[in-house]
């Protein structure tokens, strides 16, 4: 694996509080490298050590809360992950040469948000293919849980016993996402923001990725015409895996309809106690069902086959019992093996889930019919051999190939017809396509 890939994994773990238990040494051990080597990689690619990167993120987040909210300083200290006010004050004073109170006095605060509502600008390194990201998410948006319209993505969230929602729009001129969050507990804001960054793949280093893709004749034209295509992540790994199982051997549209039925039947209505009727007006009404609920749910009632229903229940039981976890995963291969032990989940789904739920940049569902079609190949082994040149960024190559394949399928050929009938987001003994 490439060194940029190691940094990418480390950033994901840091976003999941990967430095809280043992610091850089434990983080490096989880990544399978030495702590000194990890520090060198961070200095080479980011110009700062892992601890400095994590601290800078928290400081910038705290500064944002000081400037643009009326939260008390002790709540800001907790929300930005400092743990105590003393460390928070010391960190702010050292970097900004002013106390938090002095900074707030100087802040304009001309657009303060109502209580429990926050607006953040989440910057990325261009190019960023926002249109491709939103198109991908729009096709797979679960009715009631997610909604995409007019360049804006919205979804409901549940965290630490509270309901909320957020919406995302893309400001290409300032190279940032605009995240509007409504959530009642400010202590969760840092986690929410970090999860959004991962979901929209904002930490990706396009300059490193493109080096592995730009010299392949099959990709060069698309990479140059559509630079910055990212790999969409997810809010919740269990939700994504369930959605992938729902989509086995049916179209994306059909799978989306099933996900809507699943949510309406087994999901919980979004709480309106925090002034969330606005969310309902924006197409958000429910939270996706939890593993505990689906573990014993009668899923055939929404039109699933008995085998498909049992696969979802088995996954739900494994997650509810803690046997399968989607956070803090370092060994993607071991994770995929765990998934494949569940009857009805095969290598395609495992790769797809690793790609989107773990942010694994080298995940590659080589049996996917859409990928094979885009490359003009018949055998997954041939595709895997060809894809060696794209390591460690094969997930990004997959996004481009799906885009190529989806456009090529528009001609009404027999193959295109077959793709329309086959599943687009699952895993079965056959090869299963997915397209943008």
Q: What are the language-model segments listed below?
A:
Residues 1-436:
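HhH-family (HhH-GPD) DNA N-glycosylase catalytic core used in base-excision repair
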């Amino acid at each position: 694996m490439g060194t940029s890939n190691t940094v990418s994994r480390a950033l994901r773990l840091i976003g999941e509080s990967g430095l809280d238990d043992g610091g850089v040494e434990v983080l490096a051990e989880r990544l399978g490298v030495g702590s000194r080597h990890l520090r060198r990689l961070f200095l080479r690619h980011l110009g700062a050590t892992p601890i400095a990167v994590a601290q800078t993120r928290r400081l910038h987040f705290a500064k944002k809360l000081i400037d643009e909210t009326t939260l008390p300083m002790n709540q800001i200290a907790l929300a930005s992950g400092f743990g105590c006010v003393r460390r928070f004050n010391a960190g702010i004073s050292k970097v900004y040469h002013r106390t938090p109170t002095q900074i707030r006095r100087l802040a304009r605060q001309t657009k303060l948000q109502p209580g429990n509502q926050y607006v953040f600008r989440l910057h990325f390194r261009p190019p960023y293919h926002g249109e491709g990201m939103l198109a991908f998410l729009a096709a797979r948006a679960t009715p009631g849980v997610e909604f995409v319209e007019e360049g804006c993505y919205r979804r409901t969230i549940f965290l630490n016993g509270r309901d909320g929602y957020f919406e995302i729009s893309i400001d290409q001129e300032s190279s940032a996402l605009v995240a509007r969050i409504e959530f009642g507990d400010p202590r969760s804001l840092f986690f929410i923001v970090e999860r959004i960054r991962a979901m929209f793949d904002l930490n990706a280093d396009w300059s490193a990725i493109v080096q592995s893709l730009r010299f392949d004749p099959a990709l060069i034209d698309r990479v140059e015409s559509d630079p910055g295509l990212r790999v969409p992540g997810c809010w919740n790994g269990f939700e994504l895996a369930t959605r992938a199982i729902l989509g086995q051997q049916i179209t994306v549209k059909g799978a989306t309809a099933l996900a809507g039925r699943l949510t309406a039947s087994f999901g919980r209505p979004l709480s309106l106690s925090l002034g969330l009727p606005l969310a309902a007006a924006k197409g958000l009404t429910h939270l996706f069902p939890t593993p505990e609920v689906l573990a014993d749910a009668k899923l055939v009632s929404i039109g699933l086959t008995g085998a498909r229903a049992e696969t979802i229940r088995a996954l739900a039981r494994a997650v509810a019992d803690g046997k399968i976890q989607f956070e803090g995963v370092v060994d993607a291969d071991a994770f995929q093996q765990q998934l494949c032990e569940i009857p009805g989940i095969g290598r395609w789904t495992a790769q797809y889930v690793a790609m989107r739920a773990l942010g694994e940049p080298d995940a590659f569902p080589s049996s996917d019919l859409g990928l094979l079609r885009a490359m003009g190949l018949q055998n997954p082994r041939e595709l895997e051999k060809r894809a060696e040149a794209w390591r460690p960024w094969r997930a990004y190559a997959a996004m481009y190939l799906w885009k190529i394949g989806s456009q090529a399928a528009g001609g009404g050929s027999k193959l295109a017809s077959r793709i329309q009938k086959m599943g687009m987001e699952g895993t079965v003994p056959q090869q299963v396509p997915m397209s943008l």
